[in-house]
From Swiss-Prot:
GO annotation, cellular component aspect: cytoplasm; ribonuclease H2 complex
Protein name: Ribonuclease HII
Enzyme class, spelled out: hydrolase
EC number from the UniProt entry: 3.1.26.4
Cystine pairs: none
PROSITE patterns xrefs: RNASE_H_2
Species per Swiss-Prot/TrEMBL record: Chlamydia felis (strain Fe/C-56) (Chlamydophila felis)
Catalytic activity annotation: Endonucleolytic cleavage to 5'-phosphomonoester
Domain of life assignment: Bacteria
HAMAP family: RNase_HII_B
Entry's Gene Ontology molecular function annotations: manganese ion binding; RNA binding; RNA-DNA hybrid ribonuclease activity
Gene: rnhB
Length: 209
């Protein structure tokens, strides 16, 4: 059971959705990405439609949750029959080809296309997304909007799982720990072993090698 405080906190994150509902839209998807900054691995986007009026206590920006909390919330969301979500993955090769910003937009478009239900409005974290569906950019939306926060949780957990799989193929780099971000340990591994196939060749630390 969730507490009254948790319920109120969640409801405070549905204000943007309620404003859009009041304008006559009925199916609202939150959209977010993870993995723009890492030196390795794909960029992943999530799109999520939450059922109106249902409380999901604990939904928050994925970066503000512990791994345990995030995993628990991911399981709650993806196993709820009233929650609809889609995931988009854009490869390292594609990132290097079109740049990370365009790759992020592409991942978002794929995530939206992969939703099992078609939304009629999009709330997008931080980016203006050219799309045939009406959309609104929300700065720091993953901490303000419930559906964007849910999308961020689903995308983050999905990408972390992919990076753990890459660790099995390339164990020298520690992808299971830093998930491709440019930590001191990752930079040291790059210096020792050079880049592997899943490193982003267009990113400065790898491009300079």
């Amino acid at each position: 059971m969730h507490t009254l405080v948790e319920e109120q906190l969640f409801l405070s994150k549905t204000i943007f959705e309620e404003e859009v509902f009041s304008e006559g839209f009925s199916i609202i998807a939150g959209v977010d990405e993870v993995g723009r900054g890492p030196l390795a691995g794909p960029v992943v986007a999530g799109a999520c439609i939450l059922p109106r009026g249902k409380i999901f206590a604990g939904v928050n920006d994925s970066k503000k949750l512990s791994p345990k909390e995030r995993g628990r919330m991911r399981d709650i969301l993806v196993n709820d029959p009233d929650v609809y979500y889609g995931i988009g993955v854009v490869s390292v090769e594609r990132i290097d080809e079109i740049n990370i910003l365009e790759a992020t937009k592409e991942a978002m478009a794929v995530a939206i296309a992969n939703l099992p239900v078609h939304p009629d409005f999009l709330l997008v974290d931080g980016l203006h997304l050219p799309h045939k569906i009406p959309c609104k950019k929300i700065i720091k939306g993953d901490s303000k909007v419930a559906s964007i926060a849910a999308a961020s949780i689903i995308a983050k957990e999905y990408r972390d799982d992919l990076m753990r799989e890459l660790h099995q193929r390339y164990p020298d780099y520690g992808f299971d720990k830093h998930k491709g971000y440019g930590t001191a340990a990752h930079l040291a591994a790059l210096k020792a072993f050079g880049p592997c196939d899943c490193h982003r060749k267009s990113f400065a630390p790898i491009r300079r090698r």
